[in-house]
Amino acid sequence: MPIKIPAHLPAYDILTREGVMVMSEDQAARQDIRPLRIGLLNLMPKKIQTETQFARLIGATPLQIELSLIRMTEHQTKTTASEHMEEFYRPFQEVRDEKFDGLIITGAPIEHLEFSDVTYWDELGEVFAWTQSNVHSTFGVCWGGMAMINHFHGIRKHMLDHKAFGCFRHRNLDPASPYLRGFSDDFVIPVSRWTEVKQAEVDAVPELVTLLGSDEVGPCLISDPGHRALYIFNHFEYDSDTLKQEYDRDVEGGTAINVPINYYPDDDPSRKPLNRWRSHAHLLYGNWISEIYETTPYDMARIGLESTDLRG
């Protein structure tokens, strides 16, 4: 089954050309099934790029997905056309009475700020609390994941001496997890951040389970069953050239930046980078969607009140 997105959303044509099954709202209305309703709270400045990256992953599953784009209510983006935001996005305050099977909260390039200094921090706290009554499963990504784990468990983010930047080897720490079906024992994931969460602080919270980790860049994917949440601090969703774009931007802007580790062939920025994480990206987000399908109530009014495991 395809992902349902507006026909005029830029991701629609991009994903159609890539062979991803997409359908318009008119086409979806003719199918007599309940799609999984997934929200994307997009905090990234490059809205269209981020929309497309996540739509690509959740649209590759055999289930019909209805993707809803959400923004913070008062925050005004400076890097995406206001016409795009008005046509495709709804403010959080407008959707807060609705229910979602899943919610992705993206990262944001504000990791140098204390959480309390973020202009929309108070409303984001409302979002986190809202997920416990209105969302069946929430996926916090990079800064979004660090913000969630801080909100629910008080775990801090720590500044690094230098940016963790490149493709780092990670280990599968819990092969029996339903989120890791099909995962190799070891693989690479793109990393691009100035902060980290420390494994010792995660281990001090008994209800948290580290699923993926790296000796070089620490914990990557954490399961929080009590809050029906996953936190990932790295970027499976990245396109093949996303790290290149970030590197070229900093070089052109005169910002000191190292060549991303283990990304370019022979670490040569003049050569085309190879995508070595795509299959695991599809596995992770496909497994997440599958787990939602297995456990979310058919009656959306019951979301936040019960879990209905179809495997029972």
From Swiss-Prot:
Gene Ontology biological process terms, A to Z: L-methionine biosynthetic process from homoserine via O-succinyl-L-homoserine and cystathionine
Subcellular location, principal: cytoplasm
Keyword Cytoplasm: yes
SUPFAM superfamilies: Class I glutamine amidotransferase-like
InterPro entries reported for this sequence: Class_I_gatase-like, HST_MetA, MetA_family
GO cellular component annotations of the record: cytoplasm
Site features described as Important for substrate specificity, chain residue numbers: S192
EC top class named in words: transferase
Record-stated family: Belongs to the MetA family.
Name of the protein in question: Homoserine O-acetyltransferase
Protein source organism: Ruegeria pomeroyi (strain ATCC 700808 / DSM 15171 / DSS-3) (Silicibacter pomeroyi)
